[in-house]
Amino acid sequence: MDVDAAETKVQIRLTTRDSSLQISEEPNVLLVQTSLTRHKLSTLVNELLHRGDETRIPFDILINGEFLRTTIDEFLTKNGINAESTLDVEYTRALVPPLNVTSFEHDDWVSAVDVLSGVQSGQERILSASYDGLVRVWNTSGDVLATSEAPNNGGRITSLKTAKWLSEKKMVAAGLDNNVRVYKYDDDARTIITALELVNHRWGVEDVAVHAPSNRILSASSDTTISLFSSNAKENPVAPANLLPSSSAASNKRQKLSKPDRTVPARGALATFTGHSSPVSSVIFKPDDATVAYSASHDHTLKTWDLPTSTCVDTRTTGHSLLSLCAIPSRNLLATGTSARHITLIDPRASATQISVMTLRGHKNGVVSLDTDPSSEHNLASASHDGTVQIWDLRNVSTGSQIGEGMQGESVYTIYRQGRDTSKSHGEGTKVFSVRWDRAVGIVSGGEDKRVQINRALGS
């Protein structure tokens, strides 16, 4: 019987979405043995592309849109496909395991990371926010280029929870002292100076989102509200006096007369968005329309906001607290990390009838940060309190077994913290708080181990 299976052949039509890897020779329809596996099909594609051992590319193989993880024969049997059919076989560059490149030590937990790249090759800058209340800028060699000054808040160390680059010379950070701060960064002078304080929240700020072209900033808070600010002080109204520290209330009035000791101007919000009933964990601008925003909350809901009218236009209710959020524009989906240890992909469009399109399982604790692969529309990175960053390919899915959860996927790679015993990855001191995926730098993450860690695929 094994001999018969090995001799069975099937027609395949090879295709790729990568124009640089098109097979120019005819025919594109081939007759191959059904005993072939992904590895052998990858070898076949390299031969058709005339790539030798030194230039060989590892390929993943998809049949009818599903990854091949067995022989073709087993795939046909599992999916009830007749061997007389012509199979559409797509080949795509395999996701190479991201190796640990380096890590940068901090004095306290690293709550957030962001990357500034695309300015000039070799001039990438990494932004980190820490529980010591400071933001730092690093180069990719691990040198601290600049550290922010301690905020003027009575000497209290107020932990930061979030930080984003707004431009080459501006960044935004916020945390447990309820305020959002805009900083000016000078790469030549190696200084980070607080330029503006934005005041509207009564409790800590969990997340910020920025839209550089409009200078707009969104902040999500534990007080259940979302605020909209401008990074230009003059565009914002006067800060609410009842939310200003007593030492700042008077100085706020004197900001135009500030002396060299620099009184930092404080301003209020352009708008406040209410509607969540529990802390708001994450907020983002819609990628193709900055007049729309999405927010995720511990109240289990994902909300869509029309910013010009300060109106909630849609609410999607899930079964768990939502801890993180990112957009996947190519699929018109939003990825949400949950307290239930999985990632739920949601279609936010009003026409969508199903809340959960896909569920990704593999973490052992809450999923608190998400980012997409800038080089692929299919890949996603997630950071969790279980001490890992996991890499997902959204094509690596199967039919879900639970009603209402859509397709189900498993991670393709797991990144552990450098120097950690992987058998104790989700123990004390291992939580990962933030992840960013950058085309030039790689996968950057920060966590409870007081490190910024960089992982990158070999050769990238």
Swiss-Prot record:
* GO BP: chromosome organization; maturation of 5.8S rRNA from tricistronic rRNA transcript (SSU-rRNA, 5.8S rRNA, LSU-rRNA); maturation of LSU-rRNA from tricistronic rRNA transcript (SSU-rRNA, 5.8S rRNA, LSU-rRNA); protein-RNA complex remodeling
Instruction: Write out the ranges of the annotated region (Disordered).
Output: 239-264
Record's subcellular location: Nucleus, Nucleolus; Nucleus, Nucleoplasm
InterPro entries attached to this UniProt entry: G-protein_beta_WD-40_rep, NLE, WD40/YVTN_repeat-like_dom_sf, WD40_repeat_CS, WD40_repeat_dom_sf, WD40_rpt, WDR12/Ytm1
Q: What are the start and end residues of each WD repeat? A: 105-148, 155-193, 200-239, 275-315, 317-356, 362-402, 427-460
What task does this protein carry out?
A: Component of the NOP7 complex, which is required for maturation of the 25S and 5.8S ribosomal RNAs and formation of the 60S ribosome.
User: Quaternary form?
Assistant: Component of the NOP7 complex, composed of erb1, nop7 and ytm1. The complex is held together by erb1, which interacts with nop7 via its N-terminal domain and with ytm1 via a high-affinity interaction between the seven-bladed beta-propeller domains of the 2 proteins. The NOP7 complex associates with the 66S pre-ribosome. Interacts (via UBL domain) with mdn1 (via VWFA/MIDAS domain).
Instruction: Give the protein's recorded name.
Output: Ribosome biogenesis protein ytm1
What is the source species? Pyrenophora tritici-repentis (strain Pt-1C-BFP) (Wheat tan spot fungus)
As recorded in Swiss-Prot or TrEMBL, the protein's gene is named ytm1
